[in-house]
Regions:
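Nucleotide-sugar donor-binding/catalytic module of glycosyltransferases
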Residues: 1-209
Length: 209
């Protein structure tokens, strides 16, 4: 199975290297990994660093630099559109992947669900755990929800603690690429910074249509 890390970025060259290192250091999995970076016209040397990273890391890195800043929404969509994997893991360029995440997700992805929502650990810029983190996305532990089942759908949204539970936080989201591609995007959501949420909710809506 192939996973595309779809990374929108703007002037975060000092963070991207740590993210790529965290992906490279994953072990005990057999997933095929690619990295797709959509650059919103960064001016901090991101483009110049790409070839260095390509030589250093053990996965292909695909890079697209826009000639001008196209805004966050279009950059999110651009990053996912670059992916060729079975699943796209939409990842913020200032976050990192925790140890054994790919081994854990390989087991979960075998179920073939359309969308996976991961929680997060909150660290400061020195990678120290924040003492008073925000609430978890959902009440309760890990479980599978079937959104084609009305009772499951209601239960899921009743368990949401924050907007992160509504698929807003980039690095938490893994989506089946063909389901994403099937959605016809509504351009009126450009400028909201939640274009990706629209697509994910449309995927859920399509399960019930």
């Amino acid at each position: 199975m192939k996973v595309s890390f779809c990374i929108p970025t703007y002037n975060r060259v000092k963070f991207i290297e740590d993210l790529l290192e965290s992906i490279n250091n994953q072990s005990s999995h057999s997933l095929i990994v690619e990295v797709c970076i959509s650059d919103n016209a960064s001016t901090d040397g991101t483009e110049e660093s790409i070839n260095i990273w390509r030589d250093r890391f053990n996965f292909p890195i695909f890079y697209q630099r826009h000639n001008e800043n196209i805004g966050p929404d279009r950059n999110y969509l651009s990053a996912v559109n670059m992916g060729t994997g079975d699943y796209c893991w939409i990842f913020g360029s200032d976050d990192i992947l925790t140890k054994n995440s790919l081994a854990l997700m390989e087991d979960k992805l075998a179920a073939g669900s359309d969308i996976y929502l991961c929680d997060r650990r909150e660290l400061d810029i020195s990678m120290t755990k924040i003492s008073n983190p925000h609430r978890r996305w959902l009440n309760g532990g890990s479980r599978l929800f079937s959104f084609s089942n009305e009772a499951d759908l209601i239960e899921y949204f009743s368990k949401c603690n924050s907007v992160g539970g509504l698929f807003s936080y980039l690095s938490s989201i893994i989506v089946k690429r063909n389901k994403w591609s099937d959605v016809i995007f509504d351009e009126s959501y450009i400028g909201t910074a939640y274009a990706h949420v629209y697509i994910l909710l449309r995927i859920i809506n399509n399960m019930n249509s």
